[in-house]
Amino acid sequence: MTLGLVGRKVGMTRVFDEQGVSVPVTVLDMSANRVTQVKSKDTDGYTAVQVTFGQKKANRVNKAEAGHFAKAGVEAGRGLIEFALTEEKLAELKAGDEITVSMFEVGQLVDVTGTSKGKGFSGTIKRHNFGAQRTSHGNSRSHRVPGSIGMAQDPGRVFPGKRMAGQYGNTKATVQKLEVVRVDAERQLLLVKGAVPGAVNSDVVVRPSVKVGA
């Protein structure tokens, strides 16, 4: 139950630390996170804060959205997300507040969630790292097939969960315990060590890591 930020993946680059070692980092644009609603147990049955991010053209905002954003006194965003919070942390926020990248600090560990790149319909070798069969020595047109997918008349079926070919990627993915390398409060940029899921310009959610001591 921690507050996070929604940002946009700008791309990857590198920075040099004090020892001159090259550190690969992902640049995340974390600007324009606004609180649109604070939900309490009395009115909603649970405690959470609703946040909008990014910008949306006025002609793309319907009346329901326009009224919701106007009530909060914030600019219309391109999406909404909720973060479950305790009542104590919820008391510190109100509709219209802006959450900035300053909530993170250098050296902190964060979890980054995004939508992985879609690879389309892929076979078992690419999707599940299966080994290929022989390229010759009697093998005819079965070089990349998965092989046996079951047993005999008993059980007479393919068990659920069997790894097979299918849609690969384009799923929600989280990378845990990435180190914050730099926080640019002026430009609202966050630099984290390593790669994060998703393509350039895709949305990502950054939260304080839940496994810091693990």
From Swiss-Prot:
<keyword id="KW-0699">rRNA-binding</keyword>
<dbReference type="InterPro" id="IPR019926">
    <property type="entry name" value="Ribosomal_uL3_CS"/>
</dbReference>
<dbReference type="InterPro" id="IPR009000">
    <property type="entry name" value="Transl_B-barrel_sf"/>
</dbReference>
<comment type="similarity">
    <text>Belongs to the universal ribosomal protein uL3 family.</text>
</comment>
<comment type="function">
    <text>One of the primary rRNA binding proteins, it binds directly near the 3'-end of the 23S rRNA, where it nucleates assembly of the 50S subunit.</text>
</comment>
<feature type="modified residue" description="N5-methylglutamine">
    <location>
        <position position="153"/>
    </location>
</feature>
<protein>
    <recommendedName>
        <fullName>Large ribosomal subunit protein uL3</fullName>
    </recommendedName>
</protein>
<dbReference type="Pfam" id="PF00297">
    <property type="entry name" value="Ribosomal_L3"/>
</dbReference>
<keyword id="KW-0687">Ribonucleoprotein</keyword>
<dbReference type="GO" id="GO:0003735">
    <property type="term" value="F:structural constituent of ribosome"/>
</dbReference>
<dbReference type="GO" id="GO:0022625">
    <property type="term" value="C:cytosolic large ribosomal subunit"/>
</dbReference>
<dbReference type="InterPro" id="IPR019927">
    <property type="entry name" value="Ribosomal_uL3_bac/org-type"/>
</dbReference>
<dbReference type="InterPro" id="IPR000597">
    <property type="entry name" value="Ribosomal_uL3"/>
</dbReference>
<comment type="subunit">
    <text>Part of the 50S ribosomal subunit. Forms a cluster with proteins L14 and L19.</text>
</comment>
<keyword id="KW-0689">Ribosomal protein</keyword>
<keyword id="KW-0694">RNA-binding</keyword>
<keyword id="KW-0488">Methylation</keyword>
<feature type="region of interest" description="Disordered">
    <location>
        <begin position="131"/>
        <end position="155"/>
    </location>
</feature>
<dbReference type="GO" id="GO:0006412">
    <property type="term" value="P:translation"/>
</dbReference>
<dbReference type="GO" id="GO:0019843">
    <property type="term" value="F:rRNA binding"/>
</dbReference>
